Amino acid sequence: VQASNGNTSIKLDGILWIKASGKWLAHAAQEEMFVPLELAKVKASIQNDTEIASPCNPNQQLRPSIETAMHAVLRHSVVLHVHSVNAIAWAIRLDGPDLLTERLDGLPWQWIPYAASGIPLAREIQKAVANRPETDVLILGNHGLVVCGPDCHAAEKLLGEVERRLAITPRRFPKPDTTVLAIIARFSRWQFPDVDLLHALGTDAASRKILRGGVLYPCQAIFLGPTMPLLPPAAVISKFTARWSGQDTTPVFVAVERSGVMLNEKMTSAERATLIGLVHVTLRTEESARLRYLKEAEVMGVLNQGAHGYKEVLVPEESMSLSEIRQFDWQPKTISKRNGTHRESSSSGRHRQHQRGA
């Protein structure tokens, strides 16, 4: 689980306790984390295709996860949805269902093709489990893993077993070339990563090839943007001088081919965690693997959904296509949903941002 991604729930006495949107499961012992919802009302909302019912406690400020509908349609008392890097490495493959047949043999599992988070995904799961109600494990295409159980202990034990079966040994990657990266470090706002693993996005040819192909899963687009900021070494000085030195429109990281990665000092902890997760996924994915990338409409749907929580992400105007987005720098405008105000930078004003999380 990276940052606010992933969600868990438990059903007790007709109440669905679901992780709050934007909350980190890693902070569950220190913060208020779960939102109580009347399960019957949530199911009615799904049936009527209306907004998920309000929390039982009207004074609670937390909002239920966007995946609340998915948790509600599953019969199990405990549902764990995680963004396992091993599971995602299988979930992005076109041959994933076939390859997992042997790995998950003996477990009541199903593959759910990619569907948008919320009610669309919940309905796909609802159809799948209607035919096989014994299902306890779901691999969500281009998304992650769901395991279920009658209680917390059983669900956690099953999660461990599935993770063991899905485990992939990551590739080794070349060490970074700090000569080129040191040039970037001279510019304000840029720093070396404190996790060497991140350099793989620049030094590992297979990872670069994989990420050039597009967006692999929603959180990649939500937290890191729809395109990868990748530069050849020869372009470092010109690009930073002309575009990314001292501007507000810089990406949160940049990968330099055969050299490594540098981070923007404004990178948030959520963006950092998501980037680390992305590297883990690419290093577990074979260069020759046939991958399913999110389609343009799916990426745009993710960026426009605006319901994931508290992460600010770039959302282009409806008239723009994903290919047009690539012509622009990232994050030119921020809109605050709380007060309706906005600020615009010096670059194109054809973008806006929403608040989102998991």
Indicate residue ranges for each PLM-predicted region.
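Cationic, low-complexity basic patches in intrinsically disordered or flexible, solvent-exposed regions
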Residues: 354-356
